[in-house]
Amino acid sequence: MTIMSNLNIPLFPDQEKDLSSSASQPETAPIGAEILIEQLHKFYGQIKVLEDLDLHIQAGEFIAIVGRSGCGKSTLLRLIAGLEHTSYGEIKFKSARHFREGITSDDIRVMFQDPRLLPWKSILHNVQLGLNKQQLPIAEQLLEKVGLKDKAGQWPSQLSGGQRQRTALARALSHSPRILLLDEPLGALDALTRLEMQSLIERLWKEQGFTAILVTHDVSEAVQLADRIILLDKGHIAQSFEVNLPRPRHKSLEFAQLEQQVLEAVLAT
């Protein structure tokens, strides 16, 4: 599914196209994109949603954004995706793979709480959307990675909620995006399925090296997945928490302490 068209988002200002440099990059280099957000503002009429926001995200980093409802989390994600325009300020991208003049729709993919599968297409055909003939085998490979190889010929209505989100994840990764945006994709799932999806997302993130940004109301989920947790409050970054816990993460005293620290910070906003 193409989420954007005709994007022309600038790279870092000191960055120049260097084909000889990009050619020397190893094929195994991370595909994630570095993101630099500077003095970002977003208004809807007279209502300020994001104000003077600065954020630097490293290539391949996993960021979680938390905060109360209405603090600007999903708005920030839509601005990064190019689904909305900034009021002013800049969002710049730099590829860890090679330099490029801008960023395309295939470079950024979004997963929502609603998987948005086409009901008249099979699971395999949903994942194949937007792929050319040479790329079609990628869809089958991804369905195998997410544990749905045996469901390829079924319809979305035949799948559970967790299986539909696994399909959406496979579809999002079919174009090898540099950035994966996760807008509360696990919010409607039961607890066990949610844990399974967290593990799957983490495994594919580690395998593929994309930059991941997760919006969530679940502080435990943020601690489970993120390298860094950003707390938004009234359109500003209120706090930032480094998550220096080994992966894969398990419940521990350190995990619980950080979870409580972040939760108390959210409740204090």
UniProtKB/Swiss-Prot annotation:
Question: Record-annotated residues binding ATP?
Answer: 67-74
- What are the recorded GO MF terms, alphabetically? ATP binding; ATP hydrolysis activity
The protein's location, in the record's own words, is:
Cell inner membrane
Where does the ABC transporter domain lie?
35-259
Swiss-Prot/TrEMBL keywords: ATP-binding, Cell inner membrane, Cell membrane, Membrane, Nucleotide-binding, Translocase, Transport
SMART domains per the UniProt record, alphabetical: AAA
**Which Gene Ontology terms of cellular component type are present?**
plasma membrane
Q: Under which main EC class is this enzyme filed?
A: translocase
Family of this protein = Belongs to the ABC transporter superfamily. Aliphatic sulfonates importer (TC 3.A.1.17.2) family.
Tell me the function of this protein. Part of the ABC transporter complex SsuABC involved in aliphatic sulfonates import. Responsible for energy coupling to the transport system.
Protein name (record): Aliphatic sulfonates import ATP-binding protein SsuB
Q: State the organism of origin.
A: Acinetobacter baylyi (strain ATCC 33305 / BD413 / ADP1)
Q: Which gene encodes it?
A: ssuB
